[in-house]
Design a protein with these regions (language model features):
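C-terminal non-catalytic regions of proteins with extracellular/luminal or membrane-system context
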Residues: 1-320
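A short, hydrophobic C-terminal helix/tail in secreted or cell-surface proteins
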Residues: 321-326
Length: 326
């Protein structure tokens, strides 16, 4: 097994199937699917900052699905591709490395390496494309992308942890036109998922995370049943953000610098390694021993999806036992 095969196998073994009702997954051979979301053309493959990686050899989710026999609705996917190209032409990615020297001298490394990377806007397809796609298939696949979450302070509440207004509009449009909807979560961190149970059309939910360069190909194989999802959650997904005990201590938000907490805010003395920094954000783990699932278990907080949760395509049938002569 070469490196690419190993990377692909790692993805297939770690993707978590959170929901699968009505047998919407795996997709049958030659399935017709309406694809939604900008991430179908630009899947989030890695974190950012020091965790960033760009192989440059990954297919899009669209092309990966075609390679395993799935038939995406061409007009809709072509429209998304045009919209995405136009967005990046008008919003080129820029990073001014000349600022690093000044940042080092001032002790404000946080200002450079905690940079927030906003998600591209979620585009709303024209009504005629929605109508055309819904006449062609009853199944929709929405790839929900999140580019943030790879470095200390680059998460936001609005348009990040929660769906953006554009995503909410798209969600309603998808569910109004397609009775079978599968959603793939493609991003660095967790997000609010209360909207999943509020829409009965969403029959399948996959947590892809950031899968690396073999992610699109591995995802396609999982969606058509060439591989069986076998990943389990390494975290707890809460029903609401306030159920996380550390939520109120999360303060690394450069949009609101006055809310950033330091050692002094907790009555602590900075260690020597941090005293050279003019402003070093800190989060205190006040949960003590009740980190992660221990908090939910100990205090009876029911999660949306518990630590270790993960479904598969396998169906087991149990019948009543009966004695049999040896």
């Amino acid at each position: 097994m070469n490196a690419r095969e190993t990377a692909r196998q790692a993805v297939k073994s770690s993707v978590v199937l959170l929901k699968n009702e009505g047998g919407v997954l795996p997709l049958p051979q030659g399935a017709k699917v309406a694809l939604f979301g900008w991430a179908q053309w630009d899947a989030v493959l890695s974190g950012n900052g020091s965790g960033a990686a760009r192989g440059g050899v990954s297919p899009s989710v669209v092309d990966a699905l075609k390679a395993v026999g799935v038939r995406p609705e061409e007009s809709l996917s072509a429209w998304y591709q045009d919209e995405f190209k136009a967005y990046h032409k008008d919003n080129p990615s820029e990073f001014d490395f000349t600022k690093i020297k000044d940042a080092v001298n001032s002790g404000l490394m946080y200002e450079i390496f905690g940079k927030y990377i906003p998600n591209p806007p979620e585009f709303s397809p024209p009504q005629e494309l929605l109508d055309e796609a819904s006449r062609w298939t009853d199944t929709a696949l929405w790839i929900v992308g999140r580019k943030s979450g790879g470095e200390e302070c680059d998460r936001r509440l609005e348009n990040d942890y929660y769906l953006s207004n554009q995503e909410k509009v798209l969600l309603e449009a998808i569910c109004a036109h397609f009775p079978k909807v599968a959603v793939v979560l493609n991003g660095n961190g967790l997000m609010d998922l209360s909207w999943v149970e509020e829409h009965s059309q969403i029959q399948a939910l996959l947590f892809l995370g950031v899968p690396g360069e073999e992610g699109p190909a591995a995802l396609a194989e999982l969606l058509v049943g060439k591989a069986n999802p076998s990943g389990k959650l390494s975290v707890t997904i809460a029903k609401r953000r306030n159920d996380y005990p550390a939520w109120e201590d999360f303060s690394w938000d450069k949009d609101h610098p006055k809310q950033i907490k330091t050692y002094e805010d907790y009555g602590l003395t900075p260690p020597l390694v941090d005293r050279a920094f003019a402003h070093r954000p800190v989060t205190a783990y006040r949960e003590d021993i009740y980190l992660g699932y221990r908090y939910f278990d100990s205090f009876g907080i029911e999660p949306l999806y518990p630590f270790g949760f993960g479904l598969s395509y396998t169906c087991l049938l149990y019948t009543s036992p009966s004695p049999r002569d040896p």
